[in-house]
């Protein structure tokens, strides 16, 4: 399992095809955001005083993330993205 460092977050993107009138939209025509599940978080960032500020998200949260943010990574057969916490726009509460 991958463990992000600092304020980085490991996400599993929830894949969904978008259609218009039965036609599947190309990737570039889809939304500017993606829904993802938080798989793991880094420990947070340190302030100038040395205090640790923990991430705002936790493992299991569903989040809204910028569509083109992050770095694609693989762990075995699983595909993930690693993003900075600043690229997470919102926590989806259900």
Swiss-Prot record:
Keywords: Chaperone, Cytoplasm. Heptamer of 7 subunits arranged in a ring. Interacts with the chaperonin GroEL. The gene is groES. The keyword DNA damage does not apply. It is found in: Cytoplasm. SUPFAM superfamilies: GroES-like (SSF50129). Pfam families: Cpn10. The lineage of its organism: Bacteria, Bacillati, Bacillota, Bacilli, Lactobacillales. It comes from Streptococcus pneumoniae serotype 2 (strain D39 / NCTC 7466). GO terms for cellular component: cytoplasm. InterPro entries: Chaperonin_GroES, Chaperonin_GroES_sf, Chaprnonin_Cpn10_CS, GroES-like_sf. This is Co-chaperonin GroES. Together with the chaperonin GroEL, plays an essential role in assisting protein folding. The GroEL-GroES system forms a nano-cage that allows encapsulation of the non-native substrate proteins and provides a physical environment optimized to promote and accelerate protein folding. GroES binds to the apical surface of the GroEL ring, thereby capping the opening of the GroEL channel. The keyword Cytoplasm applies. GO terms for molecular function: ATP binding; metal ion binding; protein folding chaperone; protein-folding chaperone binding; unfolded protein binding. Its main location: cytoplasm. Gene3D superfamilies: GroES chaperonin. Belongs to the GroES chaperonin family. GO terms for biological process: chaperone cofactor-dependent protein refolding. PANTHER family: 10 KDA HEAT SHOCK PROTEIN, CO-CHAPERONIN GROES.
